[in-house]
Amino acid sequence: MRPLNLVITGFGTYCNRTEINLEQLGSQGLYLITGDTGSGKTTIFDAITYALYGDVNGENRTVSMIRSTFATPDIPTEVELSFDYRGKTYLVKRNPEYERRALRGNSTTKQLADAILTMPDGSVITGSEKVTSAI
């Protein structure tokens, strides 16, 4: 499996939509992610793990902790990862359960966790458990 593109929104230290084009790193298969403490290195790996498996790495972090503390109710929490597996491209999108702005009024409502996996042939698998099983 080779990650191609990662889009993170409202996730960990990434409040605003952030896109990381992993294809530009080349096809050598070895990447080095560096940065200051607190700059978001671990969050990148958590986002990839969450996109693929619906969970995060580490004993000290849980899915309920991944929403950015900087995100307002108008900002969604979601991760989108495209990846190559055996020469075919897949796209997975996931969001955890979180509080978002209600469609009517000024209140908030619960956004339920969800996932969508788009297969190379264009077919779509929906639902967190089904997507995790398919991956």
Model-derived regions, located:
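Extreme N-terminal "head/tail" segments of very large remodeling/mechanoenzyme assemblies
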Residues: 1-135
